[in-house]
Swiss-Prot record:
Keyword terms of this UniProt record: ATP-binding, Cytoplasm, Hydrolase, Nucleotide-binding, Protease, Serine protease, Stress response
Induction: By heat shock.
Lon proteolytic domain boundaries: 606-788
Protein name listed in UniProt: Lon protease
EC number(s) per entry: 3.4.21.53
Top-rank taxon: Bacteria
GO cellular component: cytoplasm
UniProt subcellular location: Cytoplasm
Gene for this chain: lon
Active site as annotated: 693, 736
Gene3D superfamilies: 1.10.8.60, 1.20.5.5270, 1.20.58.1480, 3.30.230.10, LON domain-like, P-loop containing nucleotide triphosphate hydrolases
Family: Belongs to the peptidase S16 family.
The keyword ATP-binding is annotated on this UniProt entry: yes
Native species: Sulfurihydrogenibium sp. (strain YO3AOP1)
Length: 800
């Protein structure tokens, strides 16, 4: 039977057929189509059809194409009886058959027979159709649309085109045109299920009309694109010809080449349209200038800055909290609050990214405050590593000119952008981690206030459109994560401080330093000096000896320096002897390498009258503060020395007044205050000192002198005093307690109002090793710190 012979006598068709459920394929009556058969039951159905010499099968679309073994409810009721024209076996156990649709049919019964599906089918014939004007118009229109579709580029087999044009039966014409429509299987099934030939013709006509409309639009787009390409190609061809002529004549146009190069860079830079407009405006100015003029050089430098900035380039944030925490833990010991803050930022960032709403997030502005050597700068580097961002450090120590932050205007000779834009260019991404180091040491002079310039940089509401004076166009800094570092907060202006989230880094205890040395400092120094842990081994005893005898600092910078010194001496010894053996570092070996210990950890055993151990906080950590008080013949004057500030002087006056007011309770003759002058001295005299925290220590010293009771040398104290003897809270207590611990003093008197802060900030092992006494009145301090009255033994001996 030929592919498109006249319709068979449908009465000769059998009533049962092997079934092949199809996926994504509809075969219409009269349509010839190749099918690839892979499922075993479908292959069996083909074999059954061929074995019976009928060659008939029934094709019906599967409702769910993913279902491997469909049931009756999974198969459309209306399908097509088809005849197998040709069959070919493939290498992958599949078969390929060429089929021709014969007639529509409706499944009446479905059963499984010998591993294939067999269906009972009711043949559906097209009814006779009256040749109305509408039918004639639809047929003519369909054939016209066919010609139009071919002219617009639709690919159709020429033989099929001729057959379609020769067909006059509405139903058959509709089926043949439907077979060439670019529609989905479900739409084709809907057409197959339309049993009225005229209605089917209408639906097919509408779908074909829509498809031709799309083809017309596609052709219009293609023509527009081709014209644009041809125009570009023509311009390119002409430029290449001009270039070739210039090269032939030895007249290479370097200026035009430079302009074209800048144009290309501007287009590729990803800068916003308004900034691109400014760049092109400057490029036009450059085009009109002599290439060797000074102004041309200024414009070139400006354009270079514009095209090299990362307007739209950013690194992809690492949003895995476990990996980020692991990186932070590997690089730094403890610092849990800071690590927690970074992980919070990452969590928020991840939630915002997953949200379908606003995905932008402002970078946090953190300020790490703490003594030198506690890891502020290196922590910033670790944060960048954890976030998978670029890291740039800007040192602000000693910066006095506002233009160093905001840039110089282009009218000045040698003008350049400020440090912020330079850092962005260096990072090559618009979302780096930028560390503003030593922000507390920014200077101020007649050239402006750099801290005022930082107000805009560090304000998330303003830095979205930060304008550098040199660029003159806005740059978005909102995605930058700014981290500031400082040793102290009192020198940072209040408006600038308000824009930052302050995180304090305290000094390290001896135990923490031991851990840091073992886990971080020693491996780092071994690697830097070409040795390994197999060659050099530090015992815990040796590290502790090194910490106590050769370093007295809040951080670990000097400790690392001393470790490096020891390792370098070992490296020298290995080279000199030519023998590489294992060195076990002991306290005696440290003495041999570094000399006698610089610091003594033993406290003074002798209790003295008028000598009190106070505690002070400095920008380099906590310190022991010896306060000396003595009385001498005079008229009740108060003498203060030791470079004391106004607040500390007032504390001394308050202390003196309190002791005077409590003379009776303390057993002091009130007349003594008029007979003697009081001298208070705080060594070292060259170092300025201020603050109210020495109040209780000064009061204790004065009381000691007038009562002749020695002060315990194994007790340190800190706290502010009032005229009523109340002990008020002070700051920097963790650093002060660690300073006392370093000095071997285990008993520390502290204000009661600071108890909660101390208990939360101090590590448990430090709390256990110290005797912390919390007081709210100076009388409690006297009971703890003052011993019984000193006997006048020395005077008696001198008389005899």
């Amino acid at each position: 039977m030929g592919p498109f012979e006249d319709k068979l006598d449908l009465l000769e068709l059998p009533s049962t057929y092997p079934l092949i459920p199809t996926r994504d394929v509809i075969v219409f009556p009269y349509m010839v189509f190749p099918l690839f058969i892979g499922r075993p039951f479908s292959i069996k159905a083909v074999e059954e059809a061929l074995d019976n010499n009928q060659r008939y099968i029934f094709l019906s679309l599967q409702k769910d194409k993913e279902k491997e073994i469909p049931t009756k409810k999974d198969i459309h009721e209306i399908g097509v009886v088809a005849t197998i024209i040709r069959m070919m076996k493939l290498e992958d156990n599949r078969i390929k058959i060429l089929v021709q649709g014969v007639s529509r049919g409706r499944i009446k019964e479905l059963k499984k027979v010998d591993d294939y599906y067999q269906v009972g089918v009711e043949i559906i014939e097209d009814p006779e159709v009256e040749e109305t004007l509408e039918v004639q118009a639809l047929k003519h229109s369909l054939k016209d649309l066919l010609d139009k579709a071919i002219s617009l580029g639709k690919q159709i087999v020429p033989d099929l085109v001729e057959i379609i044009k020769s067909v006059e039966e509405p139903g058959r014409l509709a089926d043949l045109v439907a077979s060439i429509l670019d529609i989905k299987a479900e739409e084709a099934q809907q057409i197959l299920e339309i049993l009225d030939p005229v209605e089917r013709l209408r639906v097919v006509h509408d779908k074909f009309l829509k498809e031709v409309g799309i083809l017309e639009l596609q052709q219009k787009i293609r023509i527009s694109a081709r014209e644009a390409i041809e125009k570009d190609q023509r311009e390119y061809f002409l430029r290449q010809q001009i270039k070739a002529i210039q090269e032939e004549l030895g007249e290479r146009d370097e200026k035009q080449e430079e302009i074209e190069n800048y144009k290309k860079k501007i287009e590729e830079s990803g800068m916003p349209d308004e900034i691109k407009e400014e760049a092109l405006k400057q490029l036009k100015r450059l085009e009109k200038m002599h290439p060797d003029s000074a102004e041309a050089g200024v414009i070139r430098t400006y354009l270079d800055w514009l095209v090299e900035l990362p307007w739209n380039k950013r690194t992809k944030d690492r949003l895995d909290l476990k990996i980020a925490k692991k990186i932070l833990d590997e690089d730094h010991y403890d610092l849990e609050k800071i690590k927690e803050r970074i992980l919070e930022y990452l969590a928020v960032l991840k939630l915002k990214k997953e949200s379908s709403k606003d995905k932008s997030i402002k970078g946090p502005i953190l300020c790490f405050v703490g003594p030198p050597g506690v890891g502020k700068t290196s922590l910033g580097r670790s944060i960048a590593k954890a976030l998978n961002r670029k890291f740039v450090r800007i040192s602000l120590g000693g910066v006095r000119d506002e233009a160093e932050i905001r840039g110089h205007r282009r009218t000045y000779v040698g003008a350049m952008p400020g440090k912020i834009i330079q850092a962005i260019k260096q990072a090559r991404t618009k979302n780096p981690v930028i560390m503003l180091d030593e922000v507390d040491k920014i200077g101020l002079d007649f050239r402006g206030d750099p801290t005022a310039a930082l107000l805009e940089v560090l304000d998330p509401e303003q830095n979205k459109e930060f304008i550098d004076h040199y660029l003159g166009v806005p740059f978005d800094l909102s995605e930058v994560m700014f981290i500031c570092t400082a040793n102290r907060l009192d020198t940072i202006p209040r408006p600038l401080l308000d824009r930052m989230e302050v995180i304090r880094l305290s000094g390290y205890s001896e135990e923490e330093k031991l851990h840091i040395a073992k886990k971080y400092l020693i491996p780092k120094q071994l690697k830097e000096n070409g040795l390994d842990e197999k060659t050099v081994e530090f015992s815990d005893k040796a590290i502790t000896f090194l910490i106590r005898g050769y370093t007295r600092e809040a951080g670990v910078r000097n400790l690392e320096r001393q470790i490096g010194s020891i390792i370098r001496k070992i490296a020298k010894k290995i080279i000199e002897t030519g023998k590489k053996r294992k060195y076990k570092i002991t306290p005696s070996l440290i003495k041999k390498f570094l000399g006698a210990p610089i610091y003594s950890t033993e406290k003074e055993e002798k209790d003295e009258v008028g000598v009190v151990t106070g505690l002070a906080w400095t920008e380099v950590g906590g310190e022991i503060l010896k306060i000396e008080v003595t009385k001498m013949d005079g008229k009740g004057n108060l003498v203060l020395t030791g470079s004391l500030g106004d607040v500390m002087k007032e504390s001394a006056r308050i202390a003196f007044s309190y002791v005077k007011s409590k003379a009776k309770e303390l057993g002091i003759d009130p007349e003594e205050f008029g007979k003697y002058d009081l001298h208070i001295h705080v060594p070292a005299g060259a170092i300025p000192k201020d603050g109210p925290s020495a109040g209780i220590a000064i009061t204790t010293g004065i009381a000691s002198v007038f009562t002749n009771r020695p002060v315990r040398s194994d007790v340190a104290m800190t706290g502010e005093i009032t005229l009523r003897g109340k002990v008020l809270p002070v700051g920097g207590l963790k650093e002060k307690i660690l300073a006392a611990k370093r000095a071997g003093i285990k008993t520390v008197i502290l204000p009661k109002d600071n108890k909660e802060e101390v208990m939360s900030d101090l590590p448990p092992y430090v709390r256990k090793s110290m005797n912390l006494i919390f007081v709210d009145h100076i009388d409690e301090v006297f009971k703890i710190a003052l011993r019984e009255e000193k006997k006048e033994v020395e005077n008696q001996e001198s008389e005899s």
